[in-house]
Amino acid sequence: MSMFLDTAKISVQAGRGGDGMVAFRREKYVPNGGPWGGDGGKGGSVIFRVNEGLRTLMDFRYNRKFKAKSGEKGMTKGMHGRGAEDLIVFVPQGTTVRDAETGKVITDLVEHGQEVVIAKGGRGGRGNIRFATPRNPAPEIAENGEPGEERQLELELKILADVGLVGFPSVGKSTLLSVVSSAKPKIGAYHFTTIVPNLGMVRTKSGDSFAMADLPGLIEGASQGVGLGTQFLRHIERTRVILHVIDMSASEGRDPYEDYVSINNELETYNLRLMERPQIIVANKMDMPEAQENLKAFKKKLAAQYDEFDDLPMIFPISSLAHQGLENLLEATAELLAKTDEFLLYDESDLVDEEAYYGFAEAEKEFEITRDDDATWVLSGEKLERLFVMTNMERDESIMKFARQLRGMGVDEALRERGAKDGDLVRIGKFEFEFVD
C-alpha cells in the first residue's frame, strides 16, 4: 500500500534568461563590420499541471527542489539563443498552492490537465544589434539574462469527493464505504484504524454515481489538533454532502446524540462553512441490541433542538455489516447531490491577484538607500537590482549605460540629498563603486 501524504513544502526556481552577445561582422565601410550579436533565449518557467492519476503528494517527500533550465546565450550572425523548455511538475487534483512566505493562496488546482505558471522564466538579454544607433553604430553593449523567479511554496491536498463520511472512530465509516463501493479501506475493531482518507466510487441502482470519501475518525478537540487533528478535516472542505455516521448501538458507551453534537461542533470550529453543507444522519449498527431504543431517544433530542418550521436532517437507519437500508440511503444521497451546488473554497479576495503575484499590478519601488556600519551606501530595490543583474560589468559601455540608467532613476540626486560625498563607496549586491559628484 502506497503512503499517503497531503502536505508538502517545496522550492521552485525558474530558469535564467540567456545572455545577449556582443559580436561584429566584417563588412567594408561599416564601423567594426556592424553589430551582429543576438539575444539570449528565455529561461524555462515552472508550471504545475494536474494529473488525475495522482492520489497523494508523496513524490514531493523525496524531491523538494524544482529548477527549470536557463536559456541559451545569444550567438553571432544575430541569431537568438534557444529558449529553455518549461519544467512541468505534476500534482494531484485538489492541490492548493500557497506562498510559504505570505501564506496567500496562489492557486487551487482541481481540473484534470489544468496548468498554472508558478514561477516565470527570466527574459533573455539583448544582443548588441539591439543597441545600434546613428550616434553609436557599433555598440559594445549586451545585456545579461534576467534571473528567473524563485519562491518557496506550501502544497496542500484536499481530496475531491462528492460525499464525505464523518463521525467518531469505530462508528462504521470504513465498513460502509467498503460495502457500497469497490474501495478496500482497512477495517479493525480499534480506534483510528483509518489513518488516511479512502476514496470510492458509488453507483446507485438508478444509475447515479458519485465519489465518497471515508475520512479518519474525529474526536472532541480535533479542530484544535487533538487526535488526528485538522490534518484530515481539510478533506471535508471539497465535499458537497456530508454523511454523519453515528453508532446507534452506543457500543463504545457514549450517547449517540452527544456524539452528533460533538462532531458538528468540531466541523463548525474548523469553519470554512462546513455546516452549510447538507447533512444526512446515518444511524449505523441498527442490527445491534438497544439500537432501536437509542434511535428513538436520538430523534426526540434532535427534534427538541429545532423549531417546528425547521426541516429536520434526514435520518437513515442502516446496518453496514448486515447490508440493511443501504439502497435508500444511497438514492437519497444522490438526489441531494443533484440539487446541491459546489462550495467555493476560496473567493477572489483569498486568491493572490495574478498581476500582483507577478509584480505588475502596482508600481514597484524603484530603489532604496541605506548605509552600512562601514559608511558604505547600499542601493537596493527590485527594479534597480534587476537592471544590475542584467548589466554586463565586464564591458565599459555596459557599465556606462547602467550609470546613465541610475542617473535617470534619480539615484545620483538621492545620494546627494542623503549626504553622499565624492569618493564615497556605493554598493549594489557585491559590486562596489565610488560615487562621483
From Swiss-Prot:
One of its GO terms (biological process) is ribosome biogenesis. It is found in: Cytoplasm. Residues 359-437 form the OCT domain. Belongs to the TRAFAC class OBG-HflX-like GTPase superfamily. OBG GTPase family. Pfam families: DUF1967 (PF09269), GTP1_OBG (PF01018), MMR_HSR1 (PF01926). GTP binds at residues 167-174, 192-196, 214-217, 284-287, 319-321. The keyword Protein transport does not apply. Residues 161-338 form the OBG-type G domain. CDD domains: Obg. GO terms for molecular function: GTP binding; GTPase activity; magnesium ion binding. Gene3D superfamilies: GTP-binding protein OBG, C-terminal domain, GTP1/OBG domain, P-loop containing nucleotide triphosphate hydrolases. It is an enzyme of class 3 (hydrolase). Mg(2+) binds at S174, T194. Coiled coil: none annotated. Residues 2-160 form the Obg domain. One of its GO terms (cellular component) is cytoplasm. Keywords: Cytoplasm, GTP-binding, Hydrolase, Magnesium, Metal-binding, Nucleotide-binding. This is GTPase Obg. Its EC number is 3.6.5.-. An essential GTPase which binds GTP, GDP and possibly (p)ppGpp with moderate affinity, with high nucleotide exchange rates and a fairly low GTP hydrolysis rate. Plays a role in control of the cell cycle, stress response, ribosome biogenesis and in those bacteria that undergo differentiation, in morphogenesis control.
